[in-house]
Amino acid sequence: NEIKPVIEKEYPILEPCFGHLKGSDISNAQELFDTHMAEALYHDGKVCGYIKAAHDIDVNLSAHTMFENLVVKASGVLAAVELVTKNDINRDDIDYVIECSEEACGDVNQRGGGNFAKSIAEIVGLQNATGSDTRGFCAAPIHSLIEASALVKSGVYKNVMVVAGGSTAKLGMNAKDHVKKGFPVLEDVVGGFAILISENDGVHPVLRTDIVGRHTVKTGSSPQAVISSLVSHSLEENGLKITDVDKYSVEMQNPDITKPAGAGNVPEANYKMIAALAVKQGDLDRKELANFIKEKGLVGWAPTQGHIPSGIPYAGHAIKDLTEGDYNRVMFVGKGSLFLGRMTNLFDGVSIVMERNDGKMEDESSVSSESEKDQI
């Protein structure tokens, strides 16, 4: 088996799992592929393995679904491994894990029963952790960031990991759009991220649990109402203006990927709406619109896999900007299209502010965002 030595070399932290890696003869696998009882795994254009259906008739445990879910788990594991190894984090100190991708694992009787979080914790070796899955389409990462902050601030847990794997379904969707328009497959990566939220240490940036924006049931779906609920309302309640935030992290899709697919420049569109709201509220002169977008915005760079680009990719950079750089305040904004699930026509979204740590350990309105590694 050519794959096993590579894994053993690159990921020694996963050594307890190596005994489960056993090669097998796949020369007669074509029949399984033809009957959809297995999904092939390819490496360098050749079949190197396959994922079998976990049940004969349950579509929730079909080879296709198992493939999607195992990609979420595996990419989430890689993100969590990067987090703990590159930041020298003691795995035994992590109490709780929140997984916030957009897939669901379960069987015919409980299709979204879960739990990706616990399965990732098991492989990474987080022996003292439990966890659960949080879902909210693309808004889930920021929902999870707020939940993790609340759990730490309340004293329920000291260290909470927020993690998510990528989406093969979104890869396929994007590839389909590119090919349809005459382009090659432009997005060829699976995204993933992991963040550790810990108690305020007086050094790392703090998450302001008192500056949280939210799209409520009564908010509505107009762009102005959405941006107001997510950005300006929570700032105003704390005596701040839109211009008091140094950087906004919104839907950070890479425009080089989205524009050829016909989706435009998503981050830029978000920043234009925030800037327009600032002008309307008198926080910004209309002549400064373009400059606001340049100064307060970011160029999208993240894979376009739904939850992966939704606000969270800037977290690691924000830590650096709020410690080594000259920023004092940034905002993370996550939005989600709940109507895709056909349970409601409502939109969704939440936001939270991260600030430079002033060194005052007794501040109970914030927790420390200790470290982050994203985009595997």
Predicted region positions:
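Condensing-enzyme catalytic core mediating Claisen C-C bond formation in acyl metabolism
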Residues: 1-70, 177-242, 280, 295-297, ...
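Claisen-condensing/thiolase-fold acyl-transfer catalytic domains that form or cleave C-C bonds
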Residues: 1-6, 29-32, 36-42, 67-69, ...
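Glycine- and small hydrophobic-enriched segments that form the cores of compact globular domains
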Residues: 28-179, 185-210
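Phosphate/pyrophosphate-binding loops at sites that engage ATP/ADP/AMP, CoA/4′-phosphopantetheine
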Residues: 79-96, 230-247, 265, 321-322, ...
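Beta-strand segments within the central parallel beta-sheet cores of soluble alpha/beta enzyme folds
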Residues: 93-100, 131-133, 158-165, 206-211, ...
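Short, mixed-charge aromatic SLiMs
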Residues: 101-104, 167-176, 217-221, 256, ...
